[in-house]
């Protein structure tokens, strides 16, 4: 409702979107895990002791067998990526995919996009520049590449100026018992007590990732790696109130330049989140907690943890990550602040649409995948109905 009011998005009520969420969940086989790994169980124990509201995360991982390869490609095919379900379904309905093609430029002609200029890589690795004509063009290159392509093509109004993320701070926790987080999927319980500003949950774990998370204070922490079986990693994620920009690189490079300015509110929420997460983990049985903050010592007592409820973490020493990016081409009827209308049509063009993470007008404060897919399907249905 906040987005509807601020950006004047048409037909954006929960009851309008619900069928699209349901369709996406059905086709991705979204469900709760049958068994919770030890890294989840200890976290859940802390949540219950703190008395906080939480939920078990549903996953698009049909028949998961805990190979812990989610981030690099499931060897069993359990993770329901696009290649497992929606691409085969699209091909069944007549969609043709041109692979090895990289769109370099949108071709503009009198208020329309007549096609794209693409670089095609042949089997012998030679490349050709080709023109592909189209009656309608949908750009779905994600929160960073969609605005880069539009700006490279001379389309700049409210494009790439409102880049947003969910800043995340990770911690490693050392327990007395063996957790063996390296042998299972990431912890699957999320604390929602402080949502939408702050979320607490579990992070992907390998020995290499553990070493990276300890590297901010490596001289003090390096011996911990040999205790990896008794360790797990968790995160604080905040909604993100800062703003950033996305710009295409110069001189023909395919890279994008990303900039995000962490706000003072972000720092405050990250600090409070660290205090709460550390307290939860200590309650759950952790001996010590190691934040990804350079110069910050390990946290061994609740008194040390709650210090950050009132104090701010040193901004320059934070090692933050994110896996959620969005809002670079916001949609809505407010042409003074949006790049596209309520259904993704780019202002100033009759036949150019965006339909990906870039169109979310603001930070959702949750994993945006479901929202992106539901809104994209809604927009596609509207396009089809409008063209009949």
Regions found by a protein language model. Name each.
Residues 60, 65-135:
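Helical element adjacent to the flavin cofactor pocket in flavoenzyme catalytic cores
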Residues 156-281, 288, 313-327, 347, ...:
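FAD cofactor-binding and catalytic pocket of flavoenzymes
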Residues 1-4, 18-25, 44, 87, ...:
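Non-transmembrane alpha-helical segments in soluble domains
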Residues 55-57, 96-98, 289:
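General small-molecule cofactor/ligand-binding pocket signal
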Residues 63-66, 70, 104-109, 286-362, ...:
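A glycine-rich dinucleotide-binding beta-alpha-beta segment and adjacent secondary-structure elements
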Residues 92, 106, 117-190, 356, ...:
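Glycine-rich loop(s) and the adjacent beta-strand/alpha-helix scaffold that form part
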Residues 1-66, 236, 261, 265:
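Rossmann-like flavin
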Residues 362-383:
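A conserved FAD-binding loop/helix module that cradles the flavin
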């Amino acid at each position: 409702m906040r987005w509807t009011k601020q950006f004047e998005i048409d037909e954006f009520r929960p009851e309008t979107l619900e069928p699209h969420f349901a369709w996406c969940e059905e086709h991705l086989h979204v469900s709760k895990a049958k068994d919770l790994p030890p890294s989840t169980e200890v976290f859940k124990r802390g949540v219950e002791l703190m008395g906080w509201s939480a939920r078990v995360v549903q996953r698009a991982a049909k028949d998961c067998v805990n190979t812990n390869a989610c981030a690099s490609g499931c060897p069993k095919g359990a993770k329901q990526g696009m290649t497992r379900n929606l691409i085969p379904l699209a091909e069944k309905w007549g969609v043709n995919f041109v692979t090895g093609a990289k769109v370099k430029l949108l071709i503009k002609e009198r208020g329309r996009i007549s096609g794209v200029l693409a670089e095609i890589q042949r089997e012998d690795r030679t490349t050709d520049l080709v023109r592909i004509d189209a009656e309608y063009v949908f750009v779905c290159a994600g929160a960073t590449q969609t605005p880069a392509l539009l700006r490279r093509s001379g389309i700049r109004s409210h494009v790439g100026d409102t880049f947003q993320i969910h800043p995340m701070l990770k911690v490693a926790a050392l327990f007395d018992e063996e957790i063996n987080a390296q042998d299972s999927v990431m912890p699957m319980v999320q604390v929602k007590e402080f949502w939408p500003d702050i979320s607490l949950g579990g992070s992907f774990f390998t020995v290499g990732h553990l070493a990276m998370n300890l590297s901010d204070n490596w001289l003090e922490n390096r011996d911990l790696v040999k205790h990896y079986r008794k360790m797990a990693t968790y995160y604080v994620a905040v909604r993100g109130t800062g703003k950033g920009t996305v710009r295409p690189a110069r001189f023909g490079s395919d890279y994008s330049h990303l900039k995000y300015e962490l706000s003072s509110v972000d720092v405050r929420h990250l600090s409070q989140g660290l205090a709460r997460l550390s307290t939860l983990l200590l309650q759950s049985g952790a001996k010590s907690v190691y934040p990804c903050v350079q110069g910050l010592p390990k946290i061994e007592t609740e008194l040390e943890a709650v210090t950050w409820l009132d104090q701010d973490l040193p901004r320059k020493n934070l090692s933050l990550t994110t896996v959620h990016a969005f809002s670079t081409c916001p949609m809505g009827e407010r042409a003074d602040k949006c790049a596209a209308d309520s259904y993704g049509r780019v202002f100033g063009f009759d036949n150019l649409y965006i339909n990906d993470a870039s169109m979310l007008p603001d930070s959702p404060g949750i994993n945006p995948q479901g929202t992106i897919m539901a809104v994209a399907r809604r927009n596609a249905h509207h396009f089809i109905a409008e063209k009949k």
